[in-house]
């Protein structure tokens, strides 16, 4: 988190956005999508990084997982370097009833990296929910 704060303090929006996107994508997506996500990431401010870092390090919501009664879907990108496999495994363990889809060839933004596969995974989840 400190490294991200230091980077954000010295980089302009476009440079910071490009850096962040370069670290979260599989590298096999349309340049226009990369530019869009870089623009979104470029809007991140230092306070947002601090709050997100605090939440990641100190906020443990796992004690609430067994209270969830609604259908749950967990979508993970096989090449995601942001959400580590052990974090995804812990979430799946805490929600054994959850539908899980591991999406091949994508990183942290599967909805952009391979929208067709992501949408198919959502449809499969919704079909399973509707089938009861």
PLM feature segments, named:
Residues 97-132:
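Catalytic active-site module of serine/aspartate enzymes centered on a nucleophile-bearing elbow/loop
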Residues 9-67:
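Conserved alpha/beta-hydrolase catalytic His-Asp/Glu region
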Residues 66, 93-94:
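Solvent-exposed polar/charged
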Residues 1-4:
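Charged helix-capping and loop-helix junction motifs
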């Amino acid at each position: 988190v400190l490294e991200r704060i230091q980077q954000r303090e010295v980089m302009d929006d476009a440079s910071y956005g490009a850096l962040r996107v370069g670290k979260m994508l599989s590298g096999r997506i349309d340049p226009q999508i990369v530019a869009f996500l870089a623009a979104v990431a470029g809007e991140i401010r230092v306070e947002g990084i601090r709050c997100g870092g605090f939440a990641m390090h100190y906020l443990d919501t796992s004690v609430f997982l067994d209270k969830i009664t609604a259908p749950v879907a967990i979508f993970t990108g096989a090449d995601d370097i942001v959400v580590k496999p052990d974090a995804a495994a812990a979430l799946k363990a805490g929600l054994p009833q959850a539908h899980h889809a591991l999406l091949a060839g994508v990183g942290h933004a599967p909805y952009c990296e391979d929208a067709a596969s992501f949408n198919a995974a959502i449809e499969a989840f919704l079909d399973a929910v509707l089938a009861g």
